[in-house]
């Protein structure tokens, strides 16, 4: 990334462990941050924190389970901040269990957060990036989306779907100067990991 040029960066799950680390890093490089998180209080607090440090940020709180929120978020960011140069689909849900323990709710919620929300956001942002001459999209998948771990069937399945979707999108839109990639972190010490797994991982800033 060229740190000499300010970009508008939209981050989902922006107030969680990895999300907040991404927000702070991009803000420190002079970028304008669109903070998308389900917690209205935390989203505005994080935006205020960045502004107090001399950075640029705006809060766009909402629930990724809400299709209207997903479909309209990019438009709202575009109107308020003027562009979306980078979209980071960071929000995620981890539910533990094998197939005998996984519930319909586990599967449906995980698919909506881990797969459908990125799908809707990307579908909405592609025309904006195309019109602007390009952009970058990053999907936060997981190493378990590539090499599944034990006792996390639903999580591994949805992250594998996100990784496959990323590969398809990358091929389809490279000619529009839109880079679409997935990052597949190992265990990172975040609240989501602590609720779904016993192993303590790296810190988000590492």
Name every feature range the model reports, one short phrase each.
Residues 15-16:
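Conserved glycine-rich cofactor-binding loop
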Residues 98-99, 106-108:
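Substrate-binding pocket helix/loop in short-chain dehydrogenase/reductase
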Residues 102, 148-156, 168, 196:
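Active-site loop-to-helix junction immediately N-terminal to the catalytic Tyr of the SDR YXXXK motif
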Residues 122, 158:
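Active-site helix of classical SDR
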Residues 127, 171-175:
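Alpha-helical segment proximal to the catalytic Tyr-Lys
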Residues 142:
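Residue(s) in the substrate-gating loop at a strand-loop-helix junction
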Residues 185-195, 199:
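Short, flexible catalytic-loop segment of classical short-chain dehydrogenase/reductase
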């Amino acid at each position: 990334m060229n740190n000499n040029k300010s970009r508008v960066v939209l981050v989902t799950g922006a107030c969680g462990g990895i999300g907040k680390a991404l927000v702070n890093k991009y803000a420190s490089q002079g970028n304008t941050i669109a903070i998308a998180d389900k917690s209205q209080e935390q989203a505005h607090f994080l935006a205020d924190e960045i502004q107090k440090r001399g950075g640029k940020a705006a809060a766009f709180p909402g629930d990724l389970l809400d299709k209207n929120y997903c479909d309209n978020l990019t438009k709202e960011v575009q109107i308020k901040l003027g562009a979306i140069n980078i979209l980071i689909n960071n929000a995620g849900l981890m539910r533990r269990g094998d197939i005998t323990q996984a519930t319909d709710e586990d599967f449906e919620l995980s698919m909506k957060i881990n797969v459908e929300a990125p799908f809707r956001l990307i579908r909405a942002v592609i025309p904006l990036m195309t019109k602007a001459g390009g952009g970058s999209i990053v999907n936060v998948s997981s190493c378990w989306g590539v090499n599944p771990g034990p006792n996390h069937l639903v999580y591994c399945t949805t992250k594998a779907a996100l990784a496959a979707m990323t590969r398809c999108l990358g091929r389809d839109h490279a000619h529009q100067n839109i880079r679409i990639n997935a990052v597949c972190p190992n265990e990172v010490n975040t609240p989501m990991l602590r609720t779904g797994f016993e192993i303590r991982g790296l810190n988000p800033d590492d």
